[in-house]
Regions:
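Signature of the catalytic double-stranded beta-helix
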Residues: 132-144
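N-terminal secretory/targeting leader peptides
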Residues: 2-23, 31-129, 144-358
């Protein structure tokens, strides 16, 4: 027996050591699970406060979180440029300026190279469908591009059209036009058609079209309405240019701090916010297109033969994009094939998919 320690003290210390060893050794020492706490989520998006997205998707989604959590989740909305410009929104969340928010991957070229597959030219007429496809692609392959954040949902967008000041009917009409591009594949599609892609913030497009600095824009119908571009772009070619790759992410530390019993609520409500809220779904898209025509915008559907001329060029863009990425060691063709599979499962046609890759 050690000098100065009684037999009873020795036994007590021994028992404590054995218990600690069993707890640590069997992995029973886990972080304390948090229940019953409340949290306030700072939500950020570049979408304008009065636009379709904020009014019909983000605010209703956050209200649903509040309701489902029985008021234990509250929120603060930061819309438009409140926290930063559009391309900054991934970092706004990842660096903790906000807790959760919407970002556009296409606006940071080269950062999420494979995720650009979601912006290939495809006939997607609802963001609910785009999100189902994006989430499936994230699970299959794209998760590798987003370390360090909690991916809430990943999506492409509703198909973009070309909106112009003057009528466009053929490839020849497009040649030489200056067209605002959102970036990514759309930039290369515009080039492939013989036009000049111009990149500028959406908020600057109205004046640029009004003054003739640009001749048109490639974007989706919701943004035409949100930014009132229907007032300056009175003609649209209804043929898919695809659109941008986007999603909702959550700051990793904010996710860890979220009470454990509220995490399933966040997943349930936000994994497909368009399903949850009914905003920007296929049904809404149909109504939105009627709103566009009610604003006296002429929608021109390309005849099948002319559309194929455009799509042949889009497919060449896909082939080159894949070749460039595979030259860097990325399995781009595999990703494109997977995307086409996920689209076909949901009745979506990828116009830019090279048929020989089936």
């Amino acid at each position: 027996m050690c000098k100065g320690i009684t037999r009873r003290e020795f036994l007590r210390i021994s028992i404590i050591c054995i218990v600690l060893f069993l707890i640590l050794g069997t992995g029973l020492a886990k972080p304390q699970v948090t229940y019953g706490q409340t949290t306030n989520l700072r939500f950020s998006t570049w979408h304008v406060p009065v636009g379709y997205e904020v009014k019909t998707v983000w605010t209703p989604m956050l209200e649903e979180l509040k309701k489902k959590s029985k008021d234990r989740i509250n929120y603060t909305m930061f819309a438009g440029g409140a926290l930063g410009k559009g391309p900054e929104h991934f970092d706004i969340v990842s660096k903790g300026l906000s807790d959760i928010g919407y970002f556009t991957a296409t606006w940071t070229p080269g950062r999420f190279p494979l995720t650009d597959v979601l912006s290939l030219a495809a006939w997607v007429d609802g963001k609910d469908i785009a999100t189902d496809i994006g989430n499936a692609m994230y699970k299959r392959i794209l998760n590798q591009e987003f370390p360090g954040v909690k991916m809430v949902e990943l999506n492409g967008c509703i198909q973009a059209f070309m909106w112009t000041k003057k009528p466009v009917r053929t490839l020849e009409d497009v040649k030489g036009l200056r067209i605002r591009s959102p970036g990514g594949h759309q930039t290369n599609y515009i080039k492939a058609l013989g036009a000049e892609p111009i990149f500028m913030p959406l908020g600057d497009v109205y004046l640029a079209m009004e003054t003739g600095t640009i001749d048109g824009i490639v974007t989706c119908p919701p943004l035409i309405m949100s930014f009132k571009l229907h007032e300056v772009a009175k003609h649209a070619v209804v043929t898919t240019f695809g659109c941008v790759s986007e999603g909702v992410i959550m700051n990793q530390d904010s996710w860890k701090k979220t009470p454990d019993d509220l995490k399933p609520v966040v997943d349930e409500v936000c994994h497909n916010p368009f399903h949850t809220t009914g905003g920007l779904t296929r049904d809404v898209y149909k109504k939105m297109m009627k709103e566009v025509t009610d604003k006296k915008v002429e929608l021109y559907n390309l005849p099948a033969k002319e559309a194929e001329r455009w799509y042949d060029r889009f497919r060449d863009v896909t082939r080159k994009w894949v070749a460039d990425l595979e030259g860097k060691g990325l399995k781009a063709k595999e990703v494109v094939r997977a995307y086409n599979e996920e689209c076909e499962k949901r009745g979506v046609k990828v116009a830019a998919f090279p048929p020989e890759w089936k």
